[in-house]
Regions:
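Juxtamembrane intracellular "pre-TM" segments in multi-pass secondary transporters
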Residues: 1-14, 189-219, 400-405
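Structural signature of the two symmetry-related core transmembrane helices
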Residues: 80-94, 278-293
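Conserved MFS/SLC helix-loop-helix module at the cytosolic interface between two early adjacent transmembrane helices
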Residues: 64-100
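Residue-level signature of mid-helix packing/kink "hotspots" within the transmembrane helices
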Residues: 32, 59-63, 67, 151-152, ...
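Helix-to-loop junctions at the C-terminal end of transmembrane segments
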Residues: 65-77, 263-276, 360
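C-terminal membrane-cytosol helix-exit motif in multi-pass small-molecule transporters
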Residues: 176-194, 381-386
Length: 405
């Protein structure tokens, strides 16, 4: 890894990286419907169980979007995939706002999840197209920072809109999607695009199947995702079981968001200089340790410490993971590599609520021991992956050096 400091690296990032991050911030800031979807369904008069079912439907759409989005990013080009995602997301949100029967709400929630998250593989692939290996951790860090900042600030405005009318949530969500889509068409480069006749059938699937290092990374990522999403499920149950209120739980999650805003970019100045694999393993291990420490004490101070530990793991792992996938992926199938990573992360997202709750019901300590074990296994899997050869890294970066239009 290079020795450039973070300020120098950030100054050296090309303009489209900043534009992509700015557009992503606007879109994530306006992701009102995702945050308030359960409350909206209950507002329509449906049960809590029905609300949860609709939220799960949205999640199903996001998982499908990971694989489909990777294919679209490689076929249409990154800019085309981004615009398609944003414009179709706006349409899906408007349609969902008019749905009233549970079946229709369920169906449009799947479509909304699919279209809204279709942009992720294209964004990750475009970042990899735009910068070489030395700048990738910083580029993915800025993009992730924009996502988290948007998610942190958006719900405040969303809550105010919901007080006036839930319809305003859908209109605001659609408007920010349209704004990002327009920005993509006007200001972002096309990125790498592969014509169908230039790629043999099943080439991407075969490439991923042969890539032992990437396969191990996908398994590790799924394990890390399962651990991470306990923060939104069993961690809430454990906090209440310790005698704390929902306000304390919300404050603990706010510590996670605040730490990311304050510390992630400074951390990148360190992680961008270190080989990828040890950094990834450290991040996954810290996530496991952070959740594994939860049963040792129910004191608020101790729970805050555990949040800080797994948050540091998250900040160490995520930007470097994006750069690592970019390093491994051939330029012409980079979108599908990014999509496969998103799919593996989605598996953990789907399993976390149900399996985590099952483990918690068996024994409150068991789920946290499993999280610790998952962190250890995930770190070991990453460390066991073969180091990418210098020739492969050069080939993966070759697509970044030609002009993008």
């Amino acid at each position: 890894m290079g020795g450039r400091g973070l300020p120098a690296t950030l100054r050296g990032l090309p303009r489209p990286v900043w534009l992509l991050s700015a557009g992503t911030f606007v879109n994530r800031f306006g992701s009102f419907v995702l945050v308030f979807l359960v409350l909206y369904v209950k507002h329509l008069g449906y049960s809590t169980a029905a609300s949860g079912l609709v939220a799960s439907a949205y999640g199903v759409g996001t998982i499908v979007s990971a694989l489909l989005g990777g294919w679209v990013a490689d076929r249409l080009g990154r800019r085309g995939a981004l615009a398609l995602s944003m414009f179709s997301s706006a349409a899906a949100m408007l349609a969902l706002s008019q749905a009233r029967s549970l079946a229709t709400i369920f169906a449009f929630s799947i479509v909304a999840g699919l279209t809204t998250e279709l942009y992720r593989p294209a964004s990750a692939a475009l970042l990899a197209d735009l910068v070489g290996p030395e700048q990738r951790v910083a580029a993915f860090g800025i993009w992730r920072f924009a996502i988290n900042l948007g998610y942190a600030a958006g719900p405040i405005v969303g809550g105010l809109l919901a007080q006036r009318s839930f319809l305003l949530l859908f209109l605001g969500d659609a408007a920010t999607s349209l704004a990002f889509g327009a920005l993509a068409l006007v200001a972002l480069p096309k990125g790498v695009r592969v014509a169908a006749h230039l790629e043999t059938r099943g080439e991407a699937v075969r490439a991923i199947a042969r890539d032992r290092g990437f396969r191990l990374f996908l398994i590790a990522s799924a394990l890390g995702s399962f651990v991470y999403f306990q923060a939104q499920t069993t961690f809430a149950l454990q906090t209440v079981a310790y005698g704390h209120s929902s306000v304390v739980y919300g404050t603990l999650l706010a510590v996670n968001g605040l730490a990311i805003v304050l510390l992630e970019l400074p951390l990148i100045s360190v992680t961008q200089r270190v080989p990828r694999v040890p950094v990834l393993a450290t991040g996954l291990l810290l996530e496991g340790i952070g959740f594994g420490l939860i049963p040792l004490s129910g004191a608020t101070v101790w729970l805050t410490v555990t949040v800080v530990v797994w948050t540091v793991g998250e900040m160490v792992f995520s930007p470097v993971a994006g750069a690592y996938v970019a390093d491994l992926s051939p330029a012409h199938i980079r979108g599908r590599y990014s999509g496969a990573w998103g799919f593996s992360w989605g598996i953990g997202l789907v399993l976390a609520p149900s399996l985590g709750a099952l483990l918690y019901s068996v024994g409150h300590t068991l789920v946290w021991l499993v999280c610790l074990g998952c962190g250890i296994v995930a770190a070991a899997l990453v460390l066991a992956s073969p180091k990418p050869s210098s020739s492969r890294a050069a080939a993966a970066g070759a697509g970044d050096q030609r002009p993008l239009v």
